[in-house]
C-alpha cells in the first residue's frame, strides 16, 4: 500500500536471506515498525517471543489458536500492542457490529450463521464465524453454540447455529439469518478478492503503530475511524 514499505518477508519457502526474504523471523535483525503474520497459528509463540524481545507491535491474522496460544497473546498484550482479528475485512468488522446490534433488537429471534470457503480451508467453523457468534453472544449471555446439526430434535431459542460449507475456490462468504415469527433479517458479506484482507491488515498496522500496550481488534479500528 502507498506510504508503506515491506522491509522483510519471512517464509521457509524463500531463498535463504536474499532480496529481502528470510527463512526465519529470528534471522532478520533489521529495522521494523510492525510485524504482520498471515502464516499459521502454530507460529504464535515464536512471533510473540520475537516481538516482545524487540518491543515491536504485532498484528496476528491467523485463526485456529489453541487456548494456550490465546493466553500467550493476552499476556503479551500487557507489554506490547497486539492486533488480533480473525478477519481483516472492514466489511466483516461492520457486519460483526451489525450482528450484535440486531441480536440485541430481536432478543427472542432464532439466529443461524452460515459460512462458505474454498475447499482447502482447514479450520471448521471459520474464525470469522466464531467471531460473529461471540459478538452475538455478548448480548445473549446464555447462548449455546451448535456447530452443525447432527442430532434430531427441536431447536431451542438459546442456540446459535453455525454451519460450514467448503466449495471450490470461494474467498469467503458469511451470512447471519435472524428469524422471528413474522420476519427474517439476513446479513451477508462476500469477499470478492483476497487482496482486501491485505489492505485491511495494512490499515490495521497503521492504526497499531504508536499505540500503548493492549489487545486491539477490528472494532477498535472502525470505532476510531468513525470518531475522526
Indicate residue ranges for each PLM-predicted region.
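C-terminal substrate-binding/catalytic lobe of Rossmann-fold NAD(P)-dependent oxidoreductases
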Residues: 1-28, 32, 107-228
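Short acidic/histidine-rich motifs immediately flanking catalytic phosphotransfer sites
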Residues: 28-36, 53-58
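Short glycine-/small-residue-rich Rossmann-like dinucleotide-binding loops
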Residues: 39-40, 63, 164-166
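Rossmann-fold NAD(P)-binding glycine/threonine-rich loop
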Residues: 42-54, 61-84, 90-93, 97-102
